[in-house]
From Swiss-Prot:
This is DNA ligase. Its EC number is 6.5.1.2. The lineage of its organism: Bacteria, Pseudomonadati, Pseudomonadota, Gammaproteobacteria, Pasteurellales. One of its GO terms (molecular function) is DNA binding. Its cofactor is Mg(2+); Mn(2+). It comes from Mannheimia succiniciproducens (strain KCTC 0769BP / MBEL55E). PANTHER family: CHROMOSOME TRANSMISSION FIDELITY FACTOR 18 (PTHR23389), DNA LIGASE (PTHR23389:SF9). The gene is ligA. NCBIfam families: dnlj, PRK07956.1. InterPro entries: BRCT_dom (IPR001357), BRCT_dom_sf (IPR036420), DisA/LigA_HHH (IPR041663), DNA_ligase (IPR001679), DNA_ligase_AS (IPR018239), DNA_ligase_CS (IPR033136), DNAligase_adenylation (IPR013839), DNAligase_N (IPR013840).
């Protein structure tokens, strides 16, 4: 993988993480589970560690979070509320311990850790002045939080005054606000009784409760607080270990989790981690891992901090959760290219904070591999805590009335024959645009952001238009009028006019976007761009032979035949001509002559994760340099730019003796020629 590919991947990861940080920290409306965020963050961090020259000050790894919502007064934390680095395996935890051992001047034997469950709630800071609760704030972005003092005062297990005759002049207590399962269930039951919206999970309920502008509402929510550390402390001599500080907090009335333990050495820590995994279902509140801290405060100070996390602590996260449920039925869906996908209809089950009732079975081979039948008890896993998967079947529980899953021979939507081409795992409907399901998906693809980018025409509008037989081909979209659109559900005059304006704007596009929008099988964005740059106009592309098509970078025999066959079908030609007749146009494709450089006229393959520029930016740069960015390695390949976790392409390049360079090496060469 090239340095440019790595850079592009880093950029994409940063953009994705920033979006989810905004949803999580600013709106308190997370769109993905923590485990998926952790996976993305871990991937970005690993790439930046391997390529430190690509680290930028605004990377999510270099700060804690996002800015707080308006509506509450902002409070700047005197000491930043840092997050923790994560471990996802014993090996990563042991590597953390090794880093500590390497850094300490005098290594105690054994290393003692204060081990805690990682509560799945909201981090808060609570200030006591002369023993009286005076201020509380959310963590926010770690530097600035929101003033939630009035709401924190309503939480019953937080003392308004410390239980001591000799309180500190100032004391900052940090911890987690969460909602136990029992209270969460009662809250949702009451919401259902009153016809109100329920919360998806206890963390969302806690977040929504803490951020109520009316403290009376918060006071009716079953929130609980557990302390996990001391921040500012003035006018008091604190104990010399983290565990003893927690015990001191308990002694002055601050609640601390009852599962906190001292563990001597790595093996004991890992035993604690596994014991918390076993206890997790019966705790009565959500945890998503363990927090493991060097106990000695002096050692903590010696180890210090990196920009966003302490070196002396780590969160060892649990793997994705698995649950058992029953397969009630299997439905078969039809995709844009006619692919038939079996979808498992499950008895609803709560997995990792989300109710799961559907899961893909991928294809007929997967059904055979699992030996799955309707009525079976199946194991559901949310991969990365996001995508529901059936990972196993409890065949010993198969009921007597279990039914075999019969893959259809006719399309469930249009009745056309279903065929499976030799060498492909996917079976497909042969109905083409005669099939409403394929028509809908093809039209959704046509208007999508990366294709024609018609943002005023969404999936629901496409569904209505096809169902009411108002459109059959992409060109029909441009024949719609205001009156027709206003007759549709949820389409007032303003929405209808917005749709028409978007359609008019989309008429001015690029040849690459237009080719991609046509939905030719296996022609993605990169291939569409290569085709546009190579042939310069649609007539030349339409007239190209399979051999001429294979001269284009990233176009092999299979893809060339797909493109060639597409242009041999009269209905496709008619559809394209109709679009042109509706005013679709683009500027003539002009390729600037690249200056002399080592990549001009060469075929380059990208592999692995590019962190400095990202894959798409790297491909664009290669085209500017006069190179061809291909998708597979062959004897015709001149260079392979290898990023992190490069796989089979790198192996094949080494076998063929193709020159391999890193992303950093590639960029260094490019920069040298730019000078």
């Amino acid at each position: 993988m090239t340095i440019m590919d790595i850079n592009q991947q880093i950029k994409q990861l940063r953009d994705t993480l920033r979006y989810h940080e905004y949803q999580y920290h600013v709106l308190d409306d997370p769109k993905i589970p923590d485990a998926e965020y952790d996976r993305l963050f871990h991937q970005l961090k690993a790439l930046e560690q391997q390529h430190p020259e690509l680290i930028t000050a605004d990377s999510p790894t270099q700060r804690v979070g996002a800015k707080p919502l308006a509506g509450f007064a902002q409070i700047t934390h005197e000491l930043p509320m840092l997050s923790l680095d994560n471990a996802f395996s014993d090996e990563e935890f042991n590597a953390f311990v090794k880093r500590i051992q390497d850094r300490l001047i005098v290594l105690p034997q054994p290393l003692t850790f204060c081990c805690e469950p990682k509560l799945d709630g909201l981090a808060v800071s609570i200030f006591y002045v002369n023993g009286v609760l005076t201020q509380a704030a959310t963590r926010g972005d770690g530097t600035t939080g929101e003033d939630i003092t009035l709401n924190i005062r309503t939480i019953r297990n937080i003392p308004l005054q410390l239980l001591t005759d000799n309180p500190p002049a100032r004391l900052e207590v940090r911890g987690e606000v969460f909602m136990p399962h029992e209270g969460f269930n009662r809250l949702n039951e009451r919401a259902l009784e009153h016809g109100e919206k329920t919360f998806a999970n206890p963390r969302n309920a806690a977040a929504g409760s803490l951020r109520q502008l009316d403290p009376k509402i918060t006071s009716r929510r079953p929130l609980v607080f557990n302390a996990y550390s001391v921040g500012i402390a003035e006018g008091v001599e604190l104990p010399a270990t983290h565990y003893e500080r927690l015990q001191w907090l308990k002694s002055v009335g601050i609640p601390v989790n009852s599962e906190v333990q001292l563990c001597d050495g790595s093996e004991k820590v890992l035993e604690f981690y596994r014991s918390m995994q076993q206890k997790r279902p019966t705790l009565g509140y959500d945890i998503d891992g363990t927090v493991l801290k060097i106990n000695d405060i002096g050692l903590q100070r010696e180890l210090g901090f990196i920009s966003k996390a302490p070196r002396w602590a780590i969160a060892y996260k649990f793997p994705a959760q698995e649950e058992l449920t029953r397969l009630n039925d299997v439905e078969f869906q039809v995709g844009r290219t006619g692919a038939i996908t079996p979808v498992a209809k499950l008895a609803p089950v709560f997995v990792a904070g989300v109710t799961v009732s559907n899961a893909t079975l991928h294809n007929g081979d997967e059904i055979a591999r699992l030996d799955i039948a309707i009525g079976d008890t199946v194991v559901i896993r949310r991969a990365g805590d996001v995508i529901p998967q059936i990972i196993g079947v409890l065949h010993e529980r198969r009921p007597a009335n279990a039914q075999a899953i019969v893959f259809p021979t006719q399309c469930p939507v249009c009745g056309s024959k279903i065929v499976r081409i030799e060498g492909e795992a996917v079976a497909r409907c042969t109905g083409g645009l005669f099939c409403d399901a394929q028509r809908k998906e093809a039209l959704k693809h046509f208007v999508s952001r990366r294709a024609m980018d018609i943002d005023g025409v969404g999936a629901k509008l496409i569904e209505q238009l096809v169902d009411k037989e108002l459109i059959r081909t992409p060109a029909d979209l441009f024949k719609l009028d205001l009156i027709t659109l206003m007759r549709l559900e949820r389409m007032g005059e303003k929405s209808a006019q917005n749709a028409l304006d978007s359609l008019e704007k989309a008429k001015n596009t690029t040849l690459a976007r237009f080719i991609f929008a046509l939905g030719i099988r296996e022609v993605g964005e990169a291939t569409a761009l290569n085709l546009a740059n190579h042939f310069k106009n649609l007539d030349a592309l339409q007239a190209a032979s399979p051999e001429q098509l294979q001269e284009v970078a990233d176009v092999g025999e299979v893809v060339a035949n797909r493109i060639y066959v597409f242009w041999r079908e009269q209905h496709n030609i008619d559809a394209v001509n109709d679009l042109i007749a509706q005013g679709i146009h683009w500027e003539t494709v002009e390729t600037k002559e690249a200056g002399e450089n080592p990549f001009k006229g060469k075929t380059v393959v990208l592999t692995g994760t590019l962190t400095q520029m990202g894959r798409n930016e790297t491909k664009d740069l290669l085209q500017q340099l006069g190179a061809k960015a291909a998708g597979s390695v062959s004897a015709k390949t001149h260079f392979v730019i290898a990023g992190d976790n490069a796989g089979s392409k790198l192996t094949k390049a080494q076998e063929l003796g193709v020159a391999v360079m890193s992303e950093a090496e590639f960029l260094a060469i490019v920069n040298a020629y730019k000078r």
